[in-house]
């Protein structure tokens, strides 16, 4: 049986933020959420997160993100070191299994690496995740009985307690380990805080394992990025770019054309058909699906959307919770809000906003317009400056526009109202009553021309 313990109690002072460190986001998800997502795929019977600073906020966020996962939380109050943190989880650990310990601020650990660490433990050994770093400053150093990696592993010395000779060692402990649970419990009970920091170090269990004759082995990740932690905004920004580059490369390998992979951000999942083109500085959030031949212009923000084959999204368009039909044209500078559903070959032009509305095939609103809570038929032409007045101060109401309706410029459609198929609305009208099919609706003051009128003259 496998129990997973995730360390997430730290304050993150260097983040200089009131937000708990593990709730800072990387590619749109909290750091801890990345770790829990990886852990959830390992088949553990229990995912135990150790919280401390901002515990209630952290626990609520993770319960919301993983409603079906076998989550458990224990609190470390006060924070007296990594060993003290794991001691808080002891009552929840199954003696007959293996305990895997991960870091809540090391978000890019791969499931394959975590699994390799558990396999290295094999229920009998203490397995440490180590890596060689060009600059090991701040990390605990691996001590071996000799200079080579194949030499026996004897222990770990924390950076603050290391001698100059020990600090020259490049192999470091990443903070992650796997151990037989029964042995781990025994070692945790023997921890001492007799060190420079007066803390209980989890790393001290290594020397205890050696003393007990338990083999101590090391596993290593495929890349350094997997074990990089976050302690400052600079480190978070570095990890963001590393992850975004990795995601961009995966899309490029799948055939997506990114104008510049260094200027691309994915904060969720992005599914793409063939021949998809994405220009620079686009941000994709939540779950986005792009059909075959979709083209996305520069500087677009697209969240939780489906865009069908052949659609073109022009630059500076914002799409949130919307569906765009095949061959549709959207933007530039358009906004599709939640509930917007555009049919095939619909045109939504510059500075047009659509919210909670459906537009059937071939409908057009090419500039400076608002459609909210509306049902729009096929081939409708919706003039510049026209809006649906859908809110009466208390409730929202719908506007129904039939097929082949022509709405002139600068019209106000006061909902609830229905325009029958083929109706025409004269420009500048405020329509508050239904217009029958095929009829002309005009509601504006009659034009007056005053003959002989002269402009006022400036006084001398």
Curated annotation (Swiss-Prot):
What GO biological process terms are annotated to this protein in UniProt? cell morphogenesis; cell wall organization; lipid A biosynthetic process; peptidoglycan biosynthetic process; regulation of cell shape; UDP-N-acetylglucosamine biosynthetic process
- How would you classify this enzyme at the top EC level? transferase
Instruction: Enumerate the Pfam families for this protein.
Output: Hexapep, NTP_transf_3
Q: Where in the cell is it found?
A: Cytoplasm
Which residue stretches belong to region Linker?
A: 234-254
* Subunit field text: Homotrimer.
Protein's name in the database: Bifunctional protein GlmU
* Species in which this protein is naturally found: Methylibium petroleiphilum (strain ATCC BAA-1232 / LMG 22953 / PM1)
């Amino acid at each position: 049986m496998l129990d997973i313990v995730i360390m997430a109690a730290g304050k993150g002072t260097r983040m200089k933020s009131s937000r708990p460190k593990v709730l800072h986001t990387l590619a749109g998800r909290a750091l801890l959420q990345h770790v829990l997502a990886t852990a959830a795929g390992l088949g553990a019977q229990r995912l135990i997160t150790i919280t401390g600073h901002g515990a209630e906020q952290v626990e609520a966020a993770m319960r919301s993100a993983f409603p079906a996962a076998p989550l458990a939380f224990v609190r470390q109050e006060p924070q007296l070191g990594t060993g003290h943190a794991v001691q808080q989880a002891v009552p929840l650990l199954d003696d007959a299994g293996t305990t895997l310990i991960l870091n809540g601020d090391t978000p890019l650990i791969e499931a394959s690496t975590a699994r390799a660490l558990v396999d290295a433990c094999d229920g009998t050994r203490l397995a440490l995740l180590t890596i060689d770093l060009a600059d090991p400053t701040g990390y605990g150093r691996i001590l071996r009985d000799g200079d080579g990696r194949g030499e026996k592993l004897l222990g770990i010395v924390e950076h603050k307690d290391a001698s100059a000779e020990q600090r020259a060692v490049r192999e470091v402990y990443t903070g992650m380990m796997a151990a037989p649970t029964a042995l781990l419990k025994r070692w945790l009970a023997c921890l001492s805080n007799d060190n420079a920091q007066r803390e209980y170090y989890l790393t001290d269990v290594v020397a205890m394992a050696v003393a007990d004759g338990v083999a101590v082995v090391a596993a290593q990740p495929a890349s350094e990025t997997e074990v990089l932690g976050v302690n400052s905004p600079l480190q978070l920004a570095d990890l963001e770019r590393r992850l975004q580059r990795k995601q961009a490369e995966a899309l490029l390998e799948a055939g997506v054309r990114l104008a510049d992979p260094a200027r691309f951000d994915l904060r969720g999942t992005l599914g793409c058909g063939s021949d998809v083109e994405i220009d620079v500085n686009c941000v994709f959030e939540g779950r986005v699906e792009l059909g075959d031949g979709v083209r996305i212009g520069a500087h677009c923000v697209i969240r939780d959307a489906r865009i069908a084959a052949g659609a073109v999204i022009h630059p500076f368009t914002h799409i949130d919770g919307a569906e765009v039909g095949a061959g549709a044209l959207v933007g530039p500078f358009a906004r599709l809000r939640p509930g917007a559903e555009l049919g095939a070959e619909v045109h939504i032009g510059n500075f047009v906003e659509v919210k909670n509305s459906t537009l059937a095939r071939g409908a057009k609103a090419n500039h400076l317009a608002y459609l909210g809570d509306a049902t729009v038929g096929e081939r409708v032409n919706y003039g510049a400056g026209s809006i649906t007045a859908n809110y009466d101060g208390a409730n929202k109401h719908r506007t129904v526009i039939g097929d082949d309706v022509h709405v002139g410029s600068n019209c106000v459609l006061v909902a609830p109202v229905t325009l029958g198929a083929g109706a025409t609305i004269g420009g500048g009208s405020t329509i508050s009553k239904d217009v029958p099919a095929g009829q002309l609706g005009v509601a504006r003051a009659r034009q007056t021309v005053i003959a002989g009128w002269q402009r006022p003259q400036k006084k001398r």
